[in-house]
Design a protein with these regions (language model features):
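All-alpha amphipathic helical-bundle segments outside canonical DNA-binding/catalytic cores
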Residues: 119-131
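A structural signal for short hydrophobic/aromatic patches embedded in well-ordered alpha helices
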Residues: 17, 107, 126-127
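Transmembrane helix-bundle signature of multi-pass membrane transporters/permeases
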Residues: 68, 130-134
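Active-site activation/catalytic loop segments of kinase-like enzymes and analogous catalytic loops
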Residues: 73-117, 133-152
Length: 179
């Protein structure tokens, strides 16, 4: 299925994502583990869904239509995916994609300050996996949309979703180097 010409042009990304199937296996093991609990989650904690005051202090998360039961991985993973890189998923220059390790530490410290007592040790041990999983998932979603002729996310230009997928693949690679 999918657009064959686009498939040929996205071969490198397809092969990379297939090579990362261990992420899916780790996700499956996580959700089946007795210490992985479901709780209320936002499921879209990207930086553009955080409301800041005039001093740039975070006030609250907005866009609440995605709130439902889920695993902490969804919220933490999207925070890591969108906060640790200085550029967004829209960035065309892949050389600008890198991981700010101090942001990873700040997210972990801040999250654990408020939530550590709510997480099992098993969940705490999967904190960084959450970023890896969400980067992988978002790359896969952008690539799937590109291969299916941009029916979900839409596009501003012909290769928009391919570029978004490439962006997230690059971020995932950078993140994995830092694990």
């Amino acid at each position: 299925k999918g657009n064959q010409a686009r498939k040929a042009g996205a071969k490198e990304e397809i092969l990379f994502l297939i090579s990362q199937k261990n992420i899916v296996e780790r996700w499956q093991n996580f959700i089946e583990h007795k210490e992985a609990g479901k709780r209320v989650a936002h499921h879209d904690t990207k930086i553009s869904n955080v409301l800041f005051d005039e001093t740039e202090k975070g006030i609250c998360v907005i866009d609440l239509d995605t709130v439902m039961p889920g695993f902490f991985i969804s919220d933490v993973g999207d925070m890591l995916r969108t906060y640790i890189c200085p550029v967004s998923e829209e960035e065309k220059d892949l050389d600008k994609i890198f991981v700010r390790n101090e942001f990873i530490q700040a997210i972990q410290d801040g999250y654990f300050t408020e939530m550590k007592q709510c997480l099992s040790q098993f969940e705490q041990d999967h904190f960084l996996f959450s970023g890896e999983f969400l980067m992988y998932m978002q790359a896969l979603r952008f690539l799937t949309d590109y291969l299916n002729n941009d029916i979900y996310y839409g596009k501003k230009y012909e290769t928009h979703n391919l570029l978004r997928a490439q962006n997230q693949v690059q971020l995932l690679k950078e993140f994995q180097v830092n694990l």
